[in-house]
């Protein structure tokens, strides 16, 4: 297929919350598209339409990337479809996803299907960068919740913004 450098897919175990998608859209100053439902009747047609859009969009996936795709598509799951279409992707996980191993299994799934994974963002919970380095996952950073220290949250958010913009490069802005 083609390289889909104009935008960025947002995925999460069990699907992405609209609130998190909106927060990341505001942080990156990118156009947030309506979540792509996992039950899309013509997913390949919807992906083709994304290629025709001008750059700077974020496309949340409403289901887990391991979820089945329509029976009309040869791909077995959304991760396989994203990899085949070469859509750049960012994985958002909770602290519980990290602790339970779901973050690791999602990264392995996306890598297996050769999805261009920009990295992983932890959403909420305590952020421990030194411990995250030991995880061996491609961590980008942290989006704090309401319980976090506001100064630390702002600093980490700015670092996340900087890293994502670097990984997206000029074509994705």
Predicted regions and their residues:
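C-terminal accessory "lid"/substrate-recognition subdomains
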Residues: 2, 23-42, 55-59, 122, ...
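Short secondary-structure transition/capping segments
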Residues: 45-47, 131-132
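Charged, low-complexity, helix/coiled-coil-prone segments
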Residues: 24, 47-57, 103-108, 173
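Conserved catalytic-core segment of NTP-binding enzymes
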Residues: 62-163
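Walker A (P-loop) phosphate-binding motif
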Residues: 1-26
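Alpha-helix capping and helix-coil boundary motifs
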Residues: 16, 41-45, 99
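Switch II (G3) loop of P-loop NTPases
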Residues: 37-43, 51-74
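A general structural motif
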Residues: 5, 54-56, 86, 117
């Amino acid at each position: 297929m083609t390289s889909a450098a104009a935008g960025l897919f947002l995925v999460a175990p069990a699907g992405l919350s609209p609130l998190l998608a909106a927060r990341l859209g505001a942080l990156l100053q990118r156009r947030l598209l309506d979540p792509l439902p996992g039950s899309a009747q013509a997913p390949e047609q919807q992906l083709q339409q994304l290629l025709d859009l001008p750059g700077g969009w974020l496309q949340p996936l409403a289901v887990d990337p391991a979820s089945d795709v329509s029976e009309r598509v040869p791909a077995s799951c959304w991760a396989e479809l994203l990899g085949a279409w070469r859509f750049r992707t960012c994985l958002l996980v909770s602290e519980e996803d990290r602790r339970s191993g779901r973050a690791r299994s999602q990264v392995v799934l996306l890598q297996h299907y050769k999805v261009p994974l920009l990295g992983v963002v932890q959403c909420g919970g305590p952020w421990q960068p030194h411990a995250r380095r030991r995880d061996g996952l491609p961590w980008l950073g942290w989006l704090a919740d309401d319980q976090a220290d506001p100064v630390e949250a702002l600093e980490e958010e700015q670092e996340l913004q900087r890293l994502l913009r670097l990984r997206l490069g000029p074509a994705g802005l």
